């Protein structure tokens, strides 16, 4: 059911949220598997710029402060601080120093979102908006087949 991701994205927007990306042309998100295949954060960002110059933003998901430094130097537009402690996020924001936008991701809950906001990140992403939402039991039937 290929249309369901669009439905989920519309539901997030209807509830006042913003989608990370609506489709692949909105931006490149470089995750651990892309970085591993490229060999480094720097090489992954260079390849994204070379092969997808039409995209609006290049975002790099980082897991530690060394990756933060490399993403900044490589020219990432957005740096996603994934599953970092509050102390690591504070240090990452200090290192980035406004040279890229920041996003916090991983273990975001209703209980800690206000505190995460106070750290000064530009974006906070939470999968809980879609993966923890109550499910509606619906059925799709082809009436012509009945």
Describe the predicted segments one by one:
Residues 83, 106, 127-128:
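Short secondary-structure boundary segments
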Residues 110:
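Cys/His-rich Zn2+-binding cysteine-cluster or related metal-binding knuckle/ribbon modules and their
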Residues 1, 5-74, 78, 90-95, ...:
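Acidic/glycine-rich phosphate/pyrophosphate-binding loops and surrounding catalytic core
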Residues 85-89:
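Nucleotide-binding motor/catalytic cores of P-loop/tubulin-like NTPases across gene-expression machines
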Residues 128-146:
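Short, charged, intrinsically disordered terminal tails
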């Amino acid at each position: 059911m290929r249309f369901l991701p669009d439905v989920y994205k519309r539901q997030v927007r209807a509830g006042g949220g913003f989608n990370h990306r609506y489709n692949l042309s909105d931006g490149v998100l470089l995750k651990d598997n892309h970085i591993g295949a490229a060999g480094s954060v720097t090489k992954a960002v260079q390849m994204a710029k070379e092969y997808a110059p039409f995209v609006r933003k290049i975002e790099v998901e980082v897991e530690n402060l060394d990756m933060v430094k490399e993403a900044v130097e490589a020219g990432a537009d957005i740096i996603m601080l994934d599953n970092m402690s509050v102390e690591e996020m504070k240090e990452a924001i200090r290192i980035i120093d406004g040279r890229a936008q920041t996003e916090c991701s991983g273990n975001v809950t209703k209980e800690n979102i206000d505190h995460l906001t106070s750290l000064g990140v530009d974006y906070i992403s939470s999968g809980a908006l879609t993966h923890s939402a109550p499910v509606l039991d619906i059925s799709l039937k082809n009436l012509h087949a009945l």
